[in-house]
Amino acid sequence: MDILIVENKDNTISDLKTILQVLGHKVIGLASNGKVAIKIAGELNPDLILINIKLNGEMSGVEAAKFLVSLYKIPIIFITVFTKNCLTKSLQLPDDAVTISEPIRKEHLEYCISRVLEN
């Protein structure tokens, strides 16, 4: 599966790339903010996007994800340090949003990928 990572922390990017490679996926692009993510997604057409809820720049990860889904219909997994209950209420994530908490663990990422692909 071709995956776009939208993340502003180098250590998280490194962890994700390593885990995704072990799981047999290919990271086809990296972006550190929402505007770049939207541009890259349009150019590379990833199968899945992993996006941090808190991004640098004018656009949050949630705002960027809304654009990405409406423009390209690409499944999204949100990366966060918060719990899902906290996020659903404070950031108005949909109830069916798939989130993964940092630190990223291989088994959890594998589970999240399978969940998002079911929808």
Where are the regions a protein language model picked out?
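Hydrophobic/aromatic residues positioned on beta-strands within the core alpha/beta folds
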Residues: I79-T80
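Active-site residues of response regulator receiver
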Residues: N52-I53
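As written
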Residues: L91-I100
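Acidic catalytic/metal-coordinating carboxylates
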Residues: N33, M59-E63
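Short amphipathic alpha-helix used as the core "switch/output" element in two-component signaling
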Residues: V62-K73
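C-terminal output helix
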Residues: C86, I104-L117
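Acidic, metal-coordinating helix/loop segments flanking the phosphotransfer/catalytic sites
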Residues: L30-L48
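Two-component/phosphorelay signaling modules centered on CheY-like receiver
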Residues: K9-G29
